[in-house]
Amino acid sequence: MAAVELILLQRVEKLGQMGDLVRVKPGYARNFLLPGGRAIRATKANTERFEQQRAQLEAQNLKRREEAERIAERVSGLSVVIIRQAGESGGLYGSVSSRDIAVAITESGLSVNRQQIQLDQPIKMLGLTDVRVVLHPEVVLPVTVNVARSVEEAERQARGEAVGLAAEEAAAAAEAALIEVADEEEVEISA
């Protein structure tokens, strides 16, 4: 199929800035750009109308961006805790998706929807994970997601302590290092 020409109404990551004339596949235009209000078809009438409204659209975009920057500044360093069941190795029974993260962030006081969460893949292990929340196409807020089995475990993870098998392995490695040093110095360790 032939590519579709569109005029972007806002910045779209990896595609272009507001006002750019872009060529995209029909499905991308039909399913993402057009219904989301991110672009309009590049007909002669739409091009003329866009040029007439360009200043107004840029002013609206600037206002939305400034509001998003204020919100990002107010909640910078945001960290949310998500409690999930997990096995001994730290693998979750299930996963944490963008929907779960959006609910946790909304409960902490910042209203977001799951489409604003940029998550490369679902979280399937306990621990801290950094995700991006897109408040505006030009404003991205980093959020730390702390996935743990309990609130106490989440607090330990937030302090940087290892949990689960990782904690046991760290303790065993520390003990092995202590024994190795003691052997080198020929000191007896009593258990």
UniProtKB/Swiss-Prot annotation:
Name of one Pfam family that matches: Ribosomal_L9_C
Keywords in alphabetical order: Ribonucleoprotein, Ribosomal protein, RNA-binding, rRNA-binding
One record GO biological process: translation
PANTHER family linked: 50S RIBOSOMAL PROTEIN L9
Recorded family membership: Belongs to the bacterial ribosomal protein bL9 family.
Ribonucleoprotein in keyword set: yes
UniProt xrefs under InterPro entries: Ribosomal_bL9, Ribosomal_bL9/RNase_H1_N, Ribosomal_bL9_bac/chp, Ribosomal_bL9_C, Ribosomal_bL9_C_sf, Ribosomal_bL9_N, Ribosomal_bL9_N_sf
NCBIfam families linked: L9 (TIGR00158)
Function: Binds to the 23S rRNA.
GO molecular function, one term: rRNA binding
GO cellular component assignments: ribonucleoprotein complex; ribosome
UniProt keyword Ligase, yes or no: no
Protein name as it appears in the record: Large ribosomal subunit protein bL9
Entry-linked SUPFAM superfamilies: L9 N-domain-like, Ribosomal protein L9 C-domain
